[in-house]
């Protein structure tokens, strides 16, 4: 059976599989998932799969954990969350009941060797945003393997925070930009949002449209009217980044890739279409 590699939380659940199904999955090296129930004093994650106990020793909780490259916090935060793994074997406890041995690290190594290592800059892959920092968003690119989407790779137009473009748990498509010195992917999405000319073609001088304030400077206010398209309006000190406004398109200058705007109305509460609100 050909293994399909996905982001964590998108594998077949092992919770209600029968012992026979679990044996087959183990033999086929199928990646499954289950919710981690605890991180105990023995530094192992505990699960229940198919009505039986299962454990994941710390060294098997992530690729690199065995060499000390993974901190405890990265493992204990899996508690209460779906976690992917392959079944490495089965033991018995003191009462004779089965206890499955699981490895997320092996699932990640398989994902790297058979999927991620075959990708090159320019390839597009599905990702899930796992957490956001001021400098960018970390994304799961497969089996919980993390890659950075820097804030400057999220948009051509100015944004003050990665949260202006993405949210935790959001499924997005990213382009592989390059690899960092540790071999991890660096991602970008701005190329998928269209060029300046492609976005500007949807607008006409004289229109009044809805936009989002992205930056307020002394010399003017930058308003985004499409995910990769922003124009400059007059400076308005009472506006704040993230606020919705309607703007009149005064001029479009393709040769300079600039749009001149005039703020018509500002809004305190306004539900925006997904294309602008992310």
Give the predicted meaning of each segment:
Residues 8-29, 69-73, 104-121, 162, ...:
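Short boundary/loop segments of OB/S1/cold-shock single-stranded nucleic-acid-binding domains
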Residues 56-76, 110-113, 146-165, 195, ...:
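A cross-kingdom feature marking solvent-exposed beta-strand/loop segments within repeated
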Residues 75-112, 124, 131-136, 142-146, ...:
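Hydrophobic, ordered structural segments
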């Amino acid at each position: 059976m050909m293994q399909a590699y996905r982001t964590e939380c998108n594998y077949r659940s092992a919770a209600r599989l029968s012992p026979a199904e679990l044996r087959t999955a183990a033999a086929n090296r199928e990646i499954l998932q289950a919710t981690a129930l605890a991180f105990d004093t023995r530094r192992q994650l505990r699960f229940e799969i198919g009505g039986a106990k299962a454990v994941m020793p710390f060294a098997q909780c992530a690729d690199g954990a065995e060499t000390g490259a993974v901190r405890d916090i990265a493992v204990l935060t899996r508690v209460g969350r779906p976690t992917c793994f392959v079944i490495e074997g089965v033991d018995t406890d003191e009462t004779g009941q089965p206890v499955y041995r699981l490895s997320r690290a092996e699932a990640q190594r398989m994902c790297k060797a058979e999927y991620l290592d075959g990708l090159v800059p320019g390839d597009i892959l599905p990702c899930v945003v796992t957490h956001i920092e001021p400098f960018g968003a970390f994304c799961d690119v497969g089996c919980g393997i993390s890659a950075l989407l820097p804030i400057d790779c999220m948009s051509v137009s100015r944004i003050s925070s990665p949260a202006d473009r993405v949210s935790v748990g959001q499924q997005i498509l990213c382009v592989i930009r390059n690899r960092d010195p540790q071999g991890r992917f660096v991602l970008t999405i701005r190329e998928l949002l269209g060029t300046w000319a492609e976005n500007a073609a949807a607008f006409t001088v004289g229109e009044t449209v809805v936009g989002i304030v992205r930056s307020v400077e002394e010399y003017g206010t930058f308003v985004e009217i499409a995910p990769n398209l922003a124009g400059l309006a007059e400076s308005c000190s009472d506006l704040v980044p993230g606020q919705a406004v309607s703007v009149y398109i005064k001029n479009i200058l393709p040769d300079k890739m600039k749009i001149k705007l005039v703020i018509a109305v500002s809004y305190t509460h306004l539900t925006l279409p997904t294309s602008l609100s992310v």
